[in-house]
Amino acid sequence: MGLFSRRAIGNQYESLAKEYLQRQGLRFIEANFTTKVGEIDLIFKEAQTIVFVEVKYRKNSCYGDAAEMVNPAKANKLIKTAYLWLNKHGYNACNTAMRFDVVAIHSNGHDINWIANAITQG
């Protein structure tokens, strides 16, 4: 599968996750914030909390849950990228409520698992 195909599939499932989270009451801010450090798929606001979302898709869960694809190295990149986003938008990371969620999608989008606070800063 080529890069274009992976990107198109990624966009499709990120769009599905975006719609799902909006139906849950989160307010969409931005998609695909990219830096040299990494990328954040989706950014939302829930009440006063900035929510950074990693979207993962697996066609078949027999090889494990899509959420398991977020390893410690990926989590560290997400956190560093989130701090860059906060800085760019004038937020102070020490005084800003934030969390890191994962949306795991399986079965061609028929199974969506939203894991709030899936990644902790430490």
From Swiss-Prot:
InterPro entries xrefs: Restrct_endonuc-II-like, tRNA_endonuc-like_dom_sf, UPF0102_YraN-like
Disulfide bonds: none
Gene Ontology terms, MF aspect: nucleic acid binding
Coiled-coil intervals, chain numbering: none
PANTHER family listed in its UniProt record: UPF0102 PROTEIN YRAN
Record-linked HAMAP family: UPF0102
Family in the record: Belongs to the UPF0102 family.
Protein name: UPF0102 protein VV0603
Phylogenetic classification of the source organism: Bacteria, Pseudomonadati, Pseudomonadota, Gammaproteobacteria, Vibrionales
